[in-house]
Regions:
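Short edge-strand/loop segments of extracellular domains
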Residues: 2-3, 84-88, 183-185
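Surface-exposed intrinsically disordered loops and tails
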Residues: 19-41, 129-133
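Surface-exposed interaction patch
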Residues: 1-31
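C-terminal, structured domain-capping segment
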Residues: 40-94
Length: 366
């Protein structure tokens, strides 16, 4: 970024100014936006002189640096941006719209409605959202480092312990759904059965794990989890909208389980990706670019590890669906050892206390 005289602007506090050397030995200086998305503030509260007339001029150049390294992961990706000059304040994080003792779920929906999805990474899945779930939920979607949805639960320590750090999936019927950041490791079921209500993992989650949460359990809603799953065709090789319909929507099985703790759905994982991925299928044997393998860099729910979901394959008595370490959706025997992340819904009565939602400043509740 340079001013009208060609002088480099180096005092923007929201970005890191760097000097690097490209593959040909050329030195390039500027602000690093490699992992940036959403709204980036360049100048804030800048006074504009109206009289006498004055023209402020800046030149903004975006450079893709060609290093001597494998950059094949960038193939097929696109870049776009807009320059905004605004008078009104645009809210970016929860603390911009929420104060102590507001309902957490209301804070999230208010932020979404007062801002734009490209800024907050919160998408309202109403009938107007292309390829959305159409369940009126509000879901966080996009690259992990661009989403401010961290929440600290069950701890008042200034630095949230790993065991207490969660991320918000979204708001569903006034309840806030969260998923633990740090995964565990176990079988879906020790006896290799894919009936969730009697599975060893469900027993652990709603027994030992739930007890370990202490008083936080009072803030967790008892939920009717839809656990009938679906077929290979309508879960593993379908687009998110179809997956949602067969997992929890109008075409879902009547098989349910009432409990406080569960796991993510396949559709939770898939709708965690940026909207550009919502036309992909979970798995494509002939073309990985058409499957969720291609969405890894734009899906905050992707861990880089193989992990279980709560959904089973309905045409089998022992296989359940999971996410592979390559980002695609697959299924396997319930006795298989994989990672899993506990997930649950917070009651609507839960109040926001503080926090912007970043990993270092997670949301705190009452």
């Amino acid at each position: 970024i340079t001013d009208a005289s060609g002088n480099a602007v180096t005092d923007i506090t929201s970005l890191t100014y760097k000097t690097v050397t490209d593959g040909k030995g050329a030195s390039i200086s500027g602000y690093d936006i490699t992992n940036k998305s959403g709204l980036i503030t360049l100048f804030d509260k800048k006074a504009i002189t109206a009289s006498p007339t004055k023209t402020d001029e800046w030149n903004i150049t975006v450079t893709f640096i060609n290093y001597n390294a494998d950059q094949s992961n960038n193939a097929g990706n696109t870049f776009s941006g807009k320059i905004l000059i605004q008078k009104e304040f645009i809210p970016i994080v929860l603390s911009d719209v929420c104060t102590n003792e507001n309902n957490l779920a209301t804070c999230i929906t208010t932020l979404a409605n007062k801002s734009e999805p490209s800024i907050t990474n919160i998408y309202h899945h109403d009938a107007n959202l292309e390829n959305g779930a159409e369940d009126n939920s509000y879901r966080y979607a996009g690259a992990s480092n661009s989403i401010n949805n961290y929440i600290c639960l069950g701890s008042n320590e200034s630095t949230c312990p790993d065991a207490n750090l969660f991320r918000i999936i979204g708001v569903f019927e006034d309840q806030t759904k969260v998923i633990q950041v740090t995964p565990f490791y176990d079988r879906w079921d020790a006896d290799d059965s894919n009936t969730w209500s009697t599975s060893s993992l469900n027993t652990y989650l709603n027994g030992t794990y739930l007890t370990s949460l202490g008083t936080l359990t009072d803030k967790i809603a008892t939920t009717t989890w839809k656990v009938g799953g679906g077929t290979y065709a309508n879960i593993q090789t379908s687009v998110p909208k179809t997956v949602y319909q067969y997992e929890v929507g109008s075409s879902a099985s009547s098989t349910t389980n009432d409990a406080k703790i569960g796991l993510m759905y396949v559709s939770d994982y898939e709708y965690g990706a940026s909207p550009s991925a919502w036309t992909l299928v979970g798995y494509n044997s002939s073309d990985a670019t058409k499957s969720y393998r291609a969405s890894r860099s734009i899906n905050w729910m992707y861990l880089g590890l193989s992990e279980w979901t709560i959904s089973r394959i309905s045409t089998s008595s022992y296989n359940s669906f999971g996410v592979l370490n390559d980002g695609s959706v697959d299924n396997g025997p319930a006795r298989t050892l994989l990672r899993f992340r506990p997930s649950f819904y917070l009651e609507f009565s839960v109040k926001y206390v503080s926090g912007s939602g970043t990993q270092s400043d997670p949301i705190r509740i009452n």
